[in-house]
Amino acid sequence: MFATQSPRHLQVLLCRTKKFALASPPICYKVGAASSGSIRKFLSARFSTSARARNLKQSVLDNSGRHGVYLYPTLKPEPLNVVSAKDTTVVFSNGKTIEDTTCGAAVACLGYNNERVKNAMIKQMDSFCYSNSLFYGHEIGEELAAELIGGTNGEMAKVYLMCSGAEAMESAMKMARQYYMELNPRQPQRTNFIAREGSYHGSTLGALSMGGHVGRRKLFEGMLLDNNIHRVSAANEYRGKADGQTTEEYVQQLADELDRKFQEVGPETVAAFVAETLVGATLGTIPAPTGYFKAMKKVCDKYGALLILDEVMCGMGRCGSLHEWEQEGVVPDIQTVAKGLAGGFAPMAAMFINHRLSDALMSGSGVFSHGHTYQGHPVGCAAALEVQRIIREDNLVENVRKNGEYLGKLLHDQLDDHPNVGNIRGRGFFWSMEFVADKETKEPFLPSDGIAKKVHLTALNDVGISLYPGMGTKDGVAGDHAWIGPAYNCSKQDIERIVSKVKEAVVLALG
């Protein structure tokens, strides 16, 4: 075949053949008036190179354990390899199965392999998979935004769609800044934020700067925005409230601390106070004390600052209301959500803004000066929209609220008397156990004891459930906890089985 083609034809053929053109584009310009023999020689060399590449790939696989070239967060040892998942059962390549009682990282709120969500994603793929958000909008994004804003009962005005919780926090920080630059007159001096100790808002540098977990920040000290982000105490009744102090007194103490921090930083320079409405992974599902956020909002309003609530973990139904701030009696200026938004079927996150900010943008520049390549991804929007419709149509938030109370009761009944369970707290389908060496003094175990990891591995390997470990619960270094977060459609019987297995894991690990 090749011997009968003209040299020019051969040049076009080789350039248009993906195997050759992408591997070595200059070849296209060197073939010239090649003979059929040289063409055969060339093709033989290319195929031989391809074979060598395959052999090299196999060598890498053979000599590196299972993967070797995949940069996992934990490299030694490599994690278990998931091969399939259905409902709440996860199957690994070694044949082991577990019941996922944490929904991954509070993500897979409907479980795995939901047919409705899969079909919604496929339907969107059949239309188009990607749209340049800088220039174009799309109906599926508009439908999702309408669904989400409707879920706030009109309290929020607009929603910005992206891929991760860290992106959402970065967006919130920039939105807060831009809000003050849209006002007339502008307030360019508002470049500071006040956040809390022990918090976590994401792993990108801006979001990590906002977080207050010592252990997670340590490696990157010197790169973080420490001149712009200032800190107050966590709202942690178990460790922060003094003996004999009432909740009301403790809340007032925290409000006074926030007020003093505004004064210290310069009240006219603060853009926002930032907090997780219910603290997630770093401190172990700690609900705010009654009245806390109303008191914090009052301080923010006093100084003209915004309230940013991070509900990446605790929001979208996880705690028994679609938004956790509904249970706190406040409406944030900016809110971030992610994990339960699309249930893990696609990477999706969102930032809500209220009418105050929306009005400022609309009467000002009419532009949000921010952007991500995959923001508002159509397939992700389709997944999130179907997940939220299922949650609404199947009344799953009410199921979380009702069975969440039962989950908390059973955990207290089964584990309150354990000598190393210092505190059990949570809300909805988001509960933690904090482990202590001494229950009376609340003294934590030594970090070197690795208690949270021990409980996690015991649950995984010996009991067959997922318990999510957390370290640094007390001060960012010492302290251990583990949390559970079942799928929203779990029944009362599911909860009973889960708690029984949680108790088994704790007793096996700690005695």
Swiss-Prot record:
CDD domains in UniProt: OAT_like
Gene3D superfamilies in the cross-refs: Aspartate Aminotransferase, domain 1, Type I PLP-dependent aspartate aminotransferase-like (Major domain)
Signal peptide extent: none
Keyword Flavoprotein appears in the UniProt entry: no
Top-level taxonomic group: Eukaryota
Molecular function via GO: pyridoxal phosphate binding; transaminase activity
Record keywords: Aminotransferase, Pyridoxal phosphate, Transferase
Alphabetical list of InterPro entries matching this protein: Aminotrans_3, PyrdxlP-dep_Trfase, PyrdxlP-dep_Trfase_major, PyrdxlP-dep_Trfase_small
One Pfam family in the UniProt entry: Aminotran_3
Sites where the protein binds pyridoxal 5'-phosphate: G165, A166, D310, H372, T373
Biological or metabolic pathway of the protein: Secondary metabolite biosynthesis
Disulfide bond entries: none
Binding residues for substrate: Y200, G371
Cofactor requirements of the protein: pyridoxal 5'-phosphate
UniProt-listed Enzyme Commission number(s): 2.6.-.-
Function per UniProt: Aminotransferase; part of the gene cluster that mediates the biosynthesis of the lipopeptide fusaristatin A. Fusaristatin A consists of a polyketide chain linked to three amino acid residues glutamine (Gln), dehydroalanine (dehydro-Ala), and beta-aminoisobutyric acid. The biosynthesis starts with formation of a linear polyketide chain by the highly reducing polyketide synthase PKS6. The gene cluster does not contain an acyl-CoA ligase or an acyl-transferase, and it is therefore predicted that the polyketide is transferred directly to the nonribosomal peptide synthetase NRPS7.
PANTHER family linked to this entry: AMINOTRANSFERASE, AMINOTRANSFERASE CLASS-III
Family to which this protein belongs: Belongs to the class-III pyridoxal-phosphate-dependent aminotransferase family.
Name of this protein: Aminotransferase FGSG_17085
Organism: Gibberella zeae (strain ATCC MYA-4620 / CBS 123657 / FGSC 9075 / NRRL 31084 / PH-1) (Wheat head blight fungus)
